[in-house]
Amino acid sequence: MTMVTFRQGTEADAPAVNRLIEDNLQSGHLLPRTIDEILEHARRFIVAERDGAVIACAELAPLSATVAEVRSLVVDEHVRGNQIGPRLVTELAAAGAARGFATLCAFTHQPSHFVKLGFTIVPHMWVPEKIAHDCTSCPLFRRCGQYAVTLPLRVGVHVRPEQPAAVIYGGRTVGARRRNVERLHLQPSGALAPTEEDTRAVPA
């Protein structure tokens, strides 16, 4: 495969990112995004580019001063299986660590991909920032089919079983025994540079 490069998104990438998302909505694994929303947050994205075309993208979306989310992670179906998705997540994790976030989270139908990168599956309620920011307004809030996964980003941060052994979510009891996970030592590549937006408070 021709060399793939990873870089920070720009407003000019918004139409290509929008097409990627729209072309993959039928999978049921992505939430729709408006072109205006993508334009507003274009510099939060890392895009993968091959021969001048955007073939994959992912957004580092702040949920609070300490927690960021992997959002709108999508790889064009014609180039899947080439480790582009894992590379995007690694780039986001490195950028999140460089910006001082303590935790990177994702809500996904395919948690195994994230577990391979060091994430831990946790009950949804262990990511209250996401619940407050997005989930309570979602029509599937009480019957969500996604898994919550988290990755500690700060040096010295460990995931320990200090949370409750189980929580109630969506009317069912969810086992909640976390594993100890050492922080991944990720080096930022510079693909995603800080933006003015990163310094503003994120509303609940």
Regions picked out by a protein language model, each given a short descriptive name:
Residues G9, C105-A106:
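Small/polar loops that bind or transfer phosphate-bearing groups
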Residues M1-P32, E49, Q146, V155-A204:
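Short amphipathic alpha-helix that is part of the acyltransferase structural core
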Residues H41, L63, F107-H109:
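A short, compositionally biased micro-patch
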Residues A102, T108-L140:
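Conserved active-site alpha-helix within GNAT-family acetyltransferase domains
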Residues V75, G81-A98, A106:
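Conserved acetyl-CoA-binding loop-helix of GNAT-fold acetyltransferases
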Residues V47, A53-P62, T66-V74:
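Conserved beta-strand in the GNAT
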Residues E37-D51, E69, R142-G145:
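A short helix-loop-beta-strand connector motif used in the catalytic cores of GNAT acetyltransferases and
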